[in-house]
């Protein structure tokens, strides 16, 4: 007769433990990092090929109303506007400036979040046992805890966290204004390159007309020589003028090619660009850009960027000074605790935590003073960088 031997509790729980272990290993093996893809590069497919054959990807770009007005006055045909849009979408430095803005905004969000308490929820199971019965009786534990509370929140009595948040905010504003300054600088550079290309094209067209005219005069001189009206020396002189005009034409073609290459480099070798008819002279400066009031000149993005950096430096000084005062941190929690999960929600299983902490630096090897000195020096550097921006628009 077969008898049924009951399995022990530890053996019956073995499948559950194995499943839990496998689940933990599966979660641990998951990777949240995105798949790596090598970025596309604006380089030729083979050595020796032209880089124009590999146009770079262009990011979408828009223009402000003032920029639209300026570009329309400088080039009514719209070619300059297309060049500026291509440059804003292609230029890697400008794209990097935009990413710096996003980085500074994220850092400001992190710093500003320190001013608010962080509410955490947790579930913990602690088990500790010993083979020695006496040690297990004294030090063994089997405890399950579920909690909801605030951990390590600093009570900002002396403004340290507030000043750090203000410094991060002004750094973010300065970075955003720096991006606008870089945008204006790029716009000015593309306008300059476009006008230089147009002027070079006009000089090439003039040189082409002169060379054709010299060639026509040479043919007339040769006909007159055959009729006996001109000597061979006169024909040789006319032929020398033709050679000189051809050399000037070749030089003008090379200059126009360099100017067009510089423009293409700025605009990312856009494939939808076609050369506009060259102009003989650069367009005149729009009237609304002449004799601007000084207050308008002080609104430049680079000047506003410098001012925001100055404000950030001042806030950093305040944070460095607050490091000399006590730092008060608070950890709180409320929840339930039991020696088993099954009794976790029973009556009488409540638990709470209140853990204030006051820290006053006594000996830090001069770190706090050095940080304060550093903040003061950086503030003075910001002042020194700001003053030239105030004077330069008026000069």
Predicted regions and their residues:
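Terminal intrinsically disordered/low-complexity segments used for targeting and assembly
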Residues: 2-18, 24-89, 169, 253-298, ...
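Small/polar-residue-enriched beta-strand and adjacent coil segments characteristic
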Residues: 32-39, 79-86, 90, 95-98, ...
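Short, flexible active-site loop motifs that bind/organize anionic cofactors or intermediates
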Residues: 70, 225, 242, 296, ...
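Alpha-helix N-cap/helix-start motif at coil-to-helix transitions, marked by capping-box chemistry
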Residues: 74, 208-212, 286, 373, ...
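Periplasmic alpha-helical coiled-coil/stalk elements that build and connect Gram-negative outer-membrane
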Residues: 161, 170, 176-292
């Amino acid at each position: 007769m077969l008898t049924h031997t009951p399995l022990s509790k530890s053996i019956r729980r073995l499948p559950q433990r194995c499943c839990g272990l496998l689940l933990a290993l599966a979660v641990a093996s998951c990777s949240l990092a995105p798949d790596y893809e090598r970025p596309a590069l604006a380089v030729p497919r083979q050595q020796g090929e032209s880089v124009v054959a590999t146009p770079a990807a262009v990011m979408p770009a828009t223009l402000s109303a003032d920029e639209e007005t300026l570009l329309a006055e400088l080039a009514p045909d719209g070619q300059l506007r297309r060049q500026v849009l291509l440059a804003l979408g292609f230029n890697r430095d400008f794209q990097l400036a935009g990413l710096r803005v996003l980085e500074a905004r994220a850092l400001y969000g992190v710093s500003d979040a320190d001013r608010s308490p962080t509410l955490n929820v947790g579930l913990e199971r602690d088990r500790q046992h010993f083979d020695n019965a006496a040690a297990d009786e004294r030090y063994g534990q089997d405890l399950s805890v579920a909690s909801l509370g605030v951990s390590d929140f600093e009570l900002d009595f002396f403004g340290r966290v507030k000043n750090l948040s203000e410094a991060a905010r002004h750094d973010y504003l300065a970075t955003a204004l720096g991006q606008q300054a870089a945008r204006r600088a790029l716009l000015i550079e593309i306008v300059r390159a476009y006008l230089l290309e147009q002027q070079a094209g006009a000089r090439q067209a003039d040189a082409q007309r002169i060379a054709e005219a010299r060639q026509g005069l040479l043919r007339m001189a040769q006909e007159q020589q055959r009729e006996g009206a001109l000597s061979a020396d006169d024909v040789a002189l006319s032929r020398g003028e033709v050679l000189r005009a051809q050399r000037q034409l070749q030089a003008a073609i090379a200059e126009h090619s360099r100017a067009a290459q510089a423009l293409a480099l700025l605009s990312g070798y856009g494939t939808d660009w076609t050369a506009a008819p060259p102009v003989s002279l650069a367009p005149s400066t729009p009237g609304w850009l002449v004799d601007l009031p000084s207050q308008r000149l002080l609104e430049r993005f680079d000047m506003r960027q410098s001012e925001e950096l100055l404000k950030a430096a001042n806030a950093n000084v305040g944070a460095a000074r607050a490091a000399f005062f006590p730092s008060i941190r608070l950890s709180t929690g409320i929840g339930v605790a039991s020696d088993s999960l099954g009794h976790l929600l029973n009556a009488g299983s409540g638990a709470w935590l209140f853990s204030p902490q006051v820290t006053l630096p006594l000996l830090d090897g001069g770190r706090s003073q050095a940080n304060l000195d550093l903040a003061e020096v950086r503030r003075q550097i910001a002042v020194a960088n700001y003053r030239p921006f105030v004077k330069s628009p008026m000069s």
